[in-house]
Amino acid sequence: MSNTSILKDMGSYKTTLLSALINSDDICELLFNKKPYDEDDVDNLVYTQIFPYLYIDETQTKVLTYLCFEVEIPRIPTGTIKDMKLIIWAYCHKDTMKYSKKGYSGTKVDILVDMVEGQLRESDKFGIGKLQLLSCTNFSPNNKYYGKQLVYNMPDFKISNR
């Protein structure tokens, strides 16, 4: 059986994005709402505050900030290229929207998506060329949380050897 697949890149891009997010000091500091933090703290972010799928816990008791992401292949226009989308959701409890950090402005969610966009802007690890930000829109997973949704386009070869 061949180790190549049209869909294989979805998982590999999630791994690459997860690594980029947890390796950003600014993003980790915002998610923890503290500095300093240690390596164990960062490892604990995955599947508690950073999810490789859209996560909304309606029964949560902790007030946290979340980053979720998904990779989609909405179409395959040619025999060699596939259109891929990277969707990132950043949201936090409405009671914790106030946040400040030098060099950034806006609410906690505004600052978080700015940090994420800055982390990804010049990356060449996704598809062919650089990621193209298509939209940044409001996102309300429930009545207590508010956030933003980033959508990136990333064309790639139909089958790659990642």
What are these regions (language model features)?
Residues 1-78:
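Small/polar-rich, solvent-exposed N-terminal microdomains that initiate assembly or binding
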Residues 28-30, 60, 106-162:
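Acidic-leaning, charged glycine-interspersed low-complexity segments
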Residues 62-66, 81-85, 143-149:
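A general secondary-structure signal for short beta-strands and their flanking turns/coil
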